[in-house]
Amino acid sequence: MQVQCQQSPVLAGSATLVALGALVLYVAKPSGYGKHTESLKPAATRLPARAAWFLQELPSFAVPAGILARQPLSLFGPPGTVLLGLFCVHYFHRTFVYSLLNRGRPYPAVLIFRGIAFCAGNGFLQSYYLIYCAEYPDGWYTDIRFCLGVFLFILGMGVNIHSDYILRQLRKPGEITYRIPKGGLFTYVSGANFLGEIIEWIGYALATWSLPALAFAFFSVCFLGLRAFHHHRFYLKMFEDYPKSRKALIPFIF
């Protein structure tokens, strides 16, 4: 049975992402994992970082991958399937590579459940729109929005992966010591990994030219931007020799 596009869930889901992003900025507190676990009660249940990240990120891959699996196989099929494939590539890496290499602190269980719900909902929203609602002209693959958007997506993913690699090298297995990250975009900002992911989703919003992707990019800017800001304050407080010229998220600006 062919699924018909319904605009109501698309609009509702997009509005929810925007509202969540605005709420993050209003609360102005970082989510309590990683460097900011001290904000939680000591008795809070925690899971090992690798298992936690795997469980949390899995729906963002499994939901769109499951929907894609029901579509006709084609390398350059409808633009919606190709763009959703890019979404799956990002979350394949986050689920099966990043999570298994993670050397972070134990992750609060309550945040895992929130993350699973968010990832499942957002994964479905992006998939539903691109597969059942999006309509692109025949020349979309050569459109400047698609080309520039995909370029930014790949660039941002490269920055994100390279920055995560730098962070992993700062800590030996089992260590919880923090050190000053150096190299790559960390030369200019404290949140190089966050900047890379933000660039990714801005590029994705441009390439898809869709409301759900734009709403997700907005949420990412709010959530990751705030986290970069608090990471920057953390480093400045912990290290007296932290580079004073380094910014939080945007080189030379913020």
Curated annotation (Swiss-Prot):
Keywords: Differentiation, Endoplasmic reticulum, Lipid metabolism, Membrane, Microsome, NADP, Oxidoreductase, Sexual differentiation, Transmembrane, Transmembrane helix. GO terms for molecular function: 3-oxo-5-alpha-steroid 4-dehydrogenase (NADP+) activity; testosterone dehydrogenase [NAD(P)+] activity. Its main location: membrane. The keyword Oxidoreductase applies. It catalyses: a 3-oxo-5alpha-steroid + NADP(+) = a 3-oxo-Delta(4)-steroid + NADPH + H(+); 17beta-hydroxy-5alpha-androstan-3-one + NADP(+) = testosterone + NADPH + H(+); 5alpha-pregnane-3,20-dione + NADP(+) = progesterone + NADPH + H(+). Its EC number is 1.3.1.22. Optimally active at acidic pHs. InterPro entries: 3-oxo-5-alpha-steroid_4-DH, 3-oxo-5_a-steroid_4-DH_C, SRD5A/TECR. It is a multi-pass membrane protein. Converts testosterone (T) into 5-alpha-dihydrotestosterone (DHT) and progesterone or corticosterone into their corresponding 5-alpha-3-oxosteroids. It plays a central role in sexual differentiation and androgen physiology. This is 3-oxo-5-alpha-steroid 4-dehydrogenase 2. It comes from Macaca fascicularis (Crab-eating macaque).
